[in-house]
Amino acid sequence: MRTPNYINNNYFNNNNNNNNNNNNNNNNNNNNNNNNNNNNNNNQTNLNEENNDQYDMMRENLKIRNITVILKLLITMKAGITRNSSDTTGMTMTPSDQVPTPGVSKDDFNTLIIRHFRLYNNYPSPSPTTSFNSTNPQNTHQTRKSN
């Protein structure tokens, strides 16, 4: 018995429609995967940029903090000089002392620098017996100059 034409046509049409739907679904899935990949890449780029920004900000903060330390140090010294203007300590300093200011001795100056930078930059505390202008070759602070 011969199959009527309209049944055959319906069968093929349905198959074609199913295939088309499958293809469309596959395309949609591929597009979704591509979009996800793009989003992941964008997220990674944003993360990297954010990390770089945070690093730059930390570096700037450290610069500002160190500048603040130096300013505080200078203000402290100025206050000390003004307060002790009648004091002659340090008047007989040699040029190698590098602090040609009456009222502030080399030891005072070095102690001030060490104290400030230890406070703001977490440097280890020197031992109480350390002398900053000692001639002892074992002294690690001996070569530090206060410019």
Curated annotation (Swiss-Prot):
Region (Disordered): 1-49, 125-147
Bias (Low complexity) ranges: 8-49, 125-140
Superkingdom in the source lineage: Eukaryota
Protein known as: Putative uncharacterized protein DDB_G0283469
